A protein has these predicted regions:
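A short, structured beta-strand/loop element
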Residues: 18-46, 60
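The feature represents the first ordered module of a protein
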Residues: 1-29
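Acidic (Asp/Glu-rich) sequence patches and key acidic residues
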Residues: 7-17, 34-35, 60-61, 65
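Terminal leader/tail segments of proteins
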Residues: 1-3, 17-18, 35, 40, ...
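Extended, non-core accessory segments
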Residues: 2-3, 12, 24, 42, ...
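Short, compact, well-ordered microdomains
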Residues: 45-87
Length: 88
């Protein structure tokens, strides 16, 4: 059970964003986010969007830095991934 964080590479609102996910349960993800002070409004169906300025802080709090590819692979393997086409 691990909370994963990809590199900030997703541009929006004048900054770059990372995705914070769990490879086990959404509860693990929500618990980690709450302890780290990530607002619940940052949750987007299967991940939290976090701005680049929080990256180092979240890694220090225990999030495992991974590539985007590894994040998606592990999220899908966990059964927690919600594909873009299924978000409607």
């Amino acid at each position: 059970m691990t909370v994963l964080l990809d590199r900030p590479m997703w541009p929006a609102h004048g900054t770059l964003w990372s995705h914070l996910v769990s490879d086990a349960t959404l509860q693990e993800l929500h618990d980690f986010a709450a302890r780290a002070g990530v607002p619940r409004r940052s949750f987007d169906i299967d991940h939290y969007d976090v701005p680049q300025e929080r990256y180092d802080e979240l890694v220090a709090a225990g999030a495992l830095p991974v590539t985007n590819r590894e994040l998606v692979t592990r999220l899908a393997a966990s059964g927690l991934r919600v594909r873009q086409r299924d978000r409607r």
